[in-house]
């Protein structure tokens, strides 16, 4: 599968983070998270799954464990299995993040 212009697939919603599935495989999930200004994905953890956030557009306040930082387009953060993480759009513009989970979520 080849997907070009991934960010163009983002789906924004006014009430909460938008989610779009890009690919689901036996060992990997790839999705887009779309955030309007101020929207967030609250602190949570994934047992048995590692997660990578790659900022495609905008800027992101990210917390992984005890570490907090602001990421820009092209920056990434990794949350290992069981580590609490959160992400928020602090900026005035929309934010799009590629989210990769391995292994994928169970249906």
Language model features with spans:
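A short beta-strand-loop-beta hairpin characteristic of the jelly-roll/cupin
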Residues: 46-73
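Ligand-binding loop in jelly-roll beta-barrel domains
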Residues: 81-106
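Short, charged/polar surface micro-motifs in flexible loops or helix N-caps
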Residues: 26-28, 36-40, 59, 103-107
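A generic "binding-loop/recognition-motif" signal
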Residues: 28, 48, 67, 83, ...
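Histidine-centered metal-chelating micro-motifs
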Residues: 40-42, 61, 77, 81-87
């Amino acid at each position: 599968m080849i997907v070009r212009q991934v960010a163009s697939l983002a789906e924004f919603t006014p009430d909460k983070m938008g989610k779009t599935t890009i690919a689901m495989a036996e060992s990997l999930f790839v999705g887009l998270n779309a955030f309007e200004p101020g929207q967030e994905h609250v602190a949570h953890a994934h047992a048995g799954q590692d997660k990578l956030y790659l900022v495609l557009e905008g800027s992101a306040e990210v917390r992984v464990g005890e570490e907090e930082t602001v990421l820009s387009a092209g920056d990434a953060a990794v949350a290992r299995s069981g580590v609490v993480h959160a992400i928020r759009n602090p900026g005035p513009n929309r934010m799009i993040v590629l989210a990769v989970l391995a292994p994928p979520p169970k249906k």
